[in-house]
């Protein structure tokens, strides 16, 4: 039986509440500010009570306000972010799944060397890789394209490692039984590995889709055309260095709309996400 200690429980709950406040307050203030005019937002002291411009601000931002500021519609920014997030998440999962499958279940020369070469890339900072990657994208003419935005970000050493570790837990008897039943490698992968890996795939999809949605540095480098901007780049370009000339109400509305999709992904896939992180199905 776990001993109940009221003081420890109280301290633990206070720490949790403090953490929630620290995380939630910026989101709350962003929402509150999205209901105010730009003048009200920059006028001190900061109001923590919601304004009365909900319909006006959101209607204007969605139907032309953002486009007047950054030269591209809010819908286009959200669509670009959606395409980038889905392409990166799905691409990373497919490539990592296939790579781990080959490393674990195929016997070929230097397979562990190739695995460690993939794994070592985790030790390389983004800044080290980004310049040669950018040079390749420029030479291939992929600036201002979805391919340029997504292809360089599809390889994932982390996902490959996680899939490899999971595949190593597959009983050898299961592999041997599939071989006796004349199941080829791709049938084994499709009929056995994919069903067993569904919770791991779901957990990785949540993490990787949010990773793709929140990309800033790479889209900033490879997009010159405003029509290829993601929502994060659009937000940055909406903010002028002079506060008085920034439409802060549109900025706050855009920020709220930008965080809704990741929240929906986490909420809708929460059960699969937790299950994929803490359980192993076999």
Swiss-Prot record:
Record GO biological process: transmembrane transport
Pfam families: BPD_transp_1 (PF00528)
This protein's record includes keyword Cell membrane: yes
Gene3D superfamilies per UniProt: MetI-like (1.10.3720.10)
UniProt GO cellular component terms: plasma membrane
Keywords tagged on the record: Cell inner membrane, Cell membrane, Membrane, Transmembrane, Transmembrane helix, Transport
Transcription as UniProt keyword: no
Transmembrane segments annotated in the record for this chain: 14-34, 86-106, 112-132, 146-168, 201-221, 248-268
Localization of this protein: Cell inner membrane
Domain ABC transmembrane type-1: 78-269
Primary site of residence: membrane
Membrane-topology descriptor: Multi-pass membrane protein
Function, as annotated: Part of the ABC transporter complex UgpBAEC involved in sn-glycerol-3-phosphate (G3P) import. Probably responsible for the translocation of the substrate across the membrane.
Family note: Belongs to the binding-protein-dependent transport system permease family.
Assembly, per entry: The complex is composed of two ATP-binding proteins (UgpC), two transmembrane proteins (UgpA and UgpE) and a solute-binding protein (UgpB).
Name of the featured protein: sn-glycerol-3-phosphate transport system permease protein UgpE
Source organism: Brucella suis biovar 1 (strain 1330)
